A protein has these predicted regions:
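Bacterial N-terminal signal peptides
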Residues: 8-17
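Positively charged n-region of N-terminal signal peptides that target proteins for export
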Residues: 1-8
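Glycoside hydrolase catalytic-domain context in secreted enzymes
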Residues: 18, 22-519
Length: 519
């Protein structure tokens, strides 16, 4: 009798032990919050901290505790897919808990990878005044990038293009907060899926998580110098610069937010608790995670000088509400020692890691099929995406002036046409693209030659370079114009130069470049 009682108790205890050890976090039918708590309860402090840091994809196998995020290298989509499959397979099948990393990629106007479709830049997207078109474009970008393993896009920008000297205007949708909010939320819902769906089901296959940046007031620095301070005041901040981000959170359910490099009214964004916690989470109910701009926490001690060192920067960032450090462990590399020293509570680590894990479960990282390089040809740079890029470009065109109804040009009435300017024979794809090679596009000069053939004589002259003070080509440009019926003058700038202009340097040929790299 007693033996049977003991045996039954043993069976009950064994069943309870098996049930309590069930890996709920691996069950796709369980709720996201339930999966997060189950996984978090199994993690060591070292494993938790690893989730708050980022490394290169090629480094993953050497990391003892894994990494929260890996970065897609700037190579071909086929190579990215191959590396992604290897990295994620190793993470899921050969590490203690099988936690896959989030794979991030630049996808501002197409995936930053060789072979992906290049769409017009954000400033052109905003000029379409067509949110539905931008939503379709973002959906196409997501389809291409997800095929090579990307889980999260470091886009779009919700900055306002209100400072013409600021070097990243091309990345902005425009200057009006309402327009930027409409275009930005359309981009997010195209890339992530409709907010109603993502709130209920997470990120669908073929979609990506988005990152709203740069939070906030980044694009109006003093003197137009990138990273420069902004003096805005709370009313201007809320009315103009916070408005688009609020819409991204409340209406589009954006998954991540990236703080800006600069300071607003004396407080750097990466340690601004009012911005990252009180407003973002307390007022707007943001449930995603805060992802630093590259080196953003390091800037607290080596640029803004509000922290003495990387350790203090880590404390300041974590207290403000920064969950994740990119692009390499620096400040958050000190979290373990800070917890042991009592300067950071493990509960703070848990809070940040919960948010990161929640993003991973939302994106389906534990169940996603591994990327297949063999099927990329079916998805990437498909004809309908190229046609869509052309449609965006066509709708982005803005006619500022048309004296005497000169446009459109009638080739039957022209004998000669001058094509002049430093950008006439150079394709401008915009920044965050994998190529500047004319072979990947059509220059204005080549397009006119193709269109007009031998019917109209084209007189081409470069005239000058975009930078420098050499005026030796001006005479040829004047001559080309004087012997032509009409002149098409192709001016503007290039993204390479804009990255110099906005960083507070001049446009001379030998000007130094700023050492900081923007994300």
């Amino acid at each position: 009798m007693n033996l049977r009682i003991v045996a039954s108790h043993t069976i009950v205890c064994l069943c309870f032990a098996v049930a309590s050890n069930a890996q709920i976090y691996k069950d796709p039918k369980a709720g996201i919050d339930e999966r997060v708590e189950d996984l978090l309860s199994r993690m060591t402090l070292e494993e938790k901290i690893a989730q708050m840091n980022m490394n290169g994809m090629g480094e993953y196998r050497q990391l003892p505790y894994g990494a929260g995020v890996v970065e897609s290298p700037f190579i071909s989509v086929q190579e990215i897919a191959r590396m992604s499959a290897e990295t994620k397979r190793y993470a899921r099948e050969h590490t203690r808990l099988g936690i896959p990393p989030i794979q991030i990629g630049e996808c501002l106007h197409g995936q930053l990878a060789m072979g992906a479709t290049i769409f017009p830049q954000a400033i052109a997207q905003g000029s379409t005044w067509n949110p539905a078109l931008v939503e379709r474009m973002a959906s196409a970008i997501a389809l291409e990038a997800s095929a090579s393993g990307v889980d999260q896009a470091l886009s779009p920008l919700f900055d306002l293009a209100r400072e013409p000297r600021y070097g990243r205007t091309e990345e902005c949708f425009g200057e009006d907060p309402y327009l930027v909010a409409r275009m930005g939320t359309a981009f997010v819902e195209g890339m992530q899926g409709k907010a109603e769906y993502t709130r209920a089901h997470g990120i669908a296959p073929g979609k990506l998580m988005c990152t709203a940046k740069h939070f906030a007031g980044y694009s109006v620095p003093a003197g137009g110098v990138n990273l420069g301070p902004a003096s805005l005041g709370e009313r201007e901040m809320r009315t103009l610069h916070l408005y688009p981000f609020e819409k991204a959170v409340k209406e589009a359910n954006v998954c991540a937010v990236m703080p800006s490099y600069n300071e607003v009214d004396g407080i750097p964004a990466h340690c601004n608790r009012w911005l990252l916690t009180d407003v973002l989470r307390g007022e707007w109910g943001f449930r995603g995670y805060v992802f630093t701009d590259y080196g953003g926490l390091s800037h607290l001690y080596n640029f803004h000088h509000v922290a003495a060192d990387a350790s203090e920067a880590a404390v300041m960032g974590l207290n403000a509400g920064v969950d994740f450090e990119a692009a390499r462990p620096d400040a958050y590399a000190h979290l373990l020692e800070l917890v042991k020293a009592g300067k950071v509570k493990e509960e703070q680590i848990d809070t940040a890691v919960r948010r990161i894990l929640r993003a991973k479960f939302m994106a389906g990282l534990f169940e996603k099929p591994y990327p297949d390089p063999g099927r990329l040809a079916e998805v990437v740079h498909r004809p309908e995406h190229v046609a869509l890029a052309l449609e965006v470009a066509q709708e982005s065109a803005v006619l500022l002036k048309n004296d005497s109804a000169l446009l459109p040009l009638d080739a039957s009435k022209l004998k000669s046409l001058a094509v002049i300017g430093p950008n006439a024979d150079q394709v401008q794809y915009g920044d965050y693209t994998y190529t500047r090679d004319n072979r990947s596009g059509v220059t204005i000069l080549q397009g006119l030659r193709d269109r007009l053939g031998n019917r109209v004589r084209i007189n081409y002259a470069k005239g000058c370079d975009i930078t420098g003070s050499d005026r030796s080509g001006i005479a040829a440009a004047v001559e080309a114009a004087s012997k032509s019926d009409v002149a098409v003058v192709v001016l503007g700038e290039t993204s390479v130069i804009l990255s110099g202009l906005g960083w507070g340097v001049g446009l001379g040929e030998n000007e130094p470049r700023d050492p900081f790299v923007s994300g």
